Amino acid sequence: MNTMSHKFVLALDEGTTSARAILFDSDLNIVNIGQYEFPQYYPQPGYVEHDPEEIWEAQMLAVKKAISKIDAKQIVAIGITNQRETTVLWDAKSGKPVYNAIVWQDRRTSPITDWLKANYFKMIKDKTGLVPDPYFSASKIKWILDNVPNVREKAERGEIKFGTLDTYLIWRLTNGKAHVTDYSNASRTMLFNINKLECDREILELLKIPESILPEVKPSSEIYGYSEALGNLIPISGDAGDQQAALFGQVAFNVGEIKATYGTGSFILMNIGNNPIRSENLLTTIAWGLEKNKATYALEGSIFITGAAVQWFRDGLRAIDVSDEIEPLASNVEDNGGVYFVPAFVGLGAPYWDPYARGLIIGITRGTTKAHIARAILESMAYQTRDVIEVMQKESGISINSLKVDGGAAKDNLLMQFQADILGIKVIRPKVMETTSMGVAMLAGLGVGLWNSLEELRSIWKVDKEFIPSMSEEKRRALYSGWKEAVKRAMGWAKVVGGQV
């Protein structure tokens, strides 16, 4: 491995709880991984923050570990992927953050977005593809400008920079020489017009955000600057938000190709090509842009609770000791025994968008066992995925013939077979499951000519296992209709019992 003939790409994956660095070789094999956790801070209810300095330190430790077995001169490119929407403002001269990073999960800006929703919903959805929500960066920027002393005045004088975490890391890596982001991350700020591929002045004026604080928006694969942090100059040539990077890492380059990432929640993205199709129940977002003024778009559906339901089964009910025990337990029964589990712990996301829905286990009889409930929990992940995919097909007019999967639960063969059965399409699991990091490594390598085409990347990508549906159409219909009935009963429950949203 140490011979200088080997070329490597370094992917920085800046997540919500940890910073990771993954080193790939030119055949997209993983050579080494570094990972360091950093804390989240909760100064008040609904507030979620990071210290950007701690993120930087964790990211550099992860890099050091990932490249410990090679010479840094062998790294031909760096790619950066990140938790999206999380917002940092910093002093342009000193580089010091003016406030902690406000994380995507933070809900403090609800009053701002409620006002936007009431008065400007259609305009914002038409221009940005997003719905007014504290999730996105725009209201977080406004909050910092309005609430941190002197920051608005400094911003008006051009002394403040804004960035999502990709932008902040690129700024740090280049010693302040590059203030950039890519199309995919820009599309998550709620300030970017995804039709014109430029920042939207009407929304900026509405929120009183000075345009001078914004980074330059560039394609997802080009040289943005050179890292000076590893001892020699290395081009930073790939940038994408984590979910979009995973779509690219699944080589979903064609219209209608789709991926599901099963994590704490799940994210489902479908490539819809060069036309930003509008959806009633899903977000329209930019998947990536490989050249200036041209973007590939995606429909995105987010499911709030999938893997988190397994954690609840483990920690809340103490039904299992470790998460991996759920699959063998669920395998002890042939089917769910008529039991359905709706994991609406915090409401339901796409396509229901009901903050008042609450969790539900229904269909219990004297014959119900722990194994039936375990199976119902796993199956709920597959049902929710079908909910989103059905809406995607209906609203896009694009039919889907296979689903690519990644994330923790994608290792579970029982769940993946059930996913194929309930969808009636093939489910494909890749050999390398680190699709987010691999996607941005691909973008970075393309940006420096390590690979020359999407076809070349597709030929390197390898399948681990394909799951072929084997369930009858009649059984599929009956099971799914039971799920829809269970969801109906879960919806609005917090209103019935006067619970908090």
Swiss-Prot record:
Binding, sn-glycerol 3-phosphate: 16, 84-85, 135, 242
Swiss-Prot/TrEMBL keywords: ATP-binding, Glycerol metabolism, Kinase, Nucleotide-binding, Transferase
Binding annotation for ATP: 16-18, 264, 307, 311, 408
GO cellular component, one term: cytosol
Pathway listed: Polyol metabolism; glycerol degradation via glycerol kinase pathway; sn-glycerol 3-phosphate from glycerol: step 1/1
InterPro entries recorded: ATPase_NBD, Carb_kinase_FGGY, Carb_kinase_FGGY_CS, FGGY_C, FGGY_N, Glycerol_kin
GO molecular function annotations of the record: ATP binding; glycerol kinase activity
A Pfam entry, by short name: FGGY_N
Keyword Ion transport: no
Sites where the protein binds glycerol: 84-85, 135, 242-243
Known EC number: 2.7.1.30
Annotated positions binding ADP: 16, 20, 264, 307, 408
Catalytic reactions of this protein: glycerol + ATP = sn-glycerol 3-phosphate + ADP + H(+)
Gene Ontology BP annotations: glycerol catabolic process; glycerol metabolic process; glycerol-3-phosphate metabolic process
Organism superkingdom: Archaea
Role according to the record: Key enzyme in the regulation of glycerol uptake and metabolism. Catalyzes the phosphorylation of glycerol to yield sn-glycerol 3-phosphate.
Family named by the database record: Belongs to the FGGY kinase family.
Name of the protein described by the UniProt record: Glycerol kinase 1
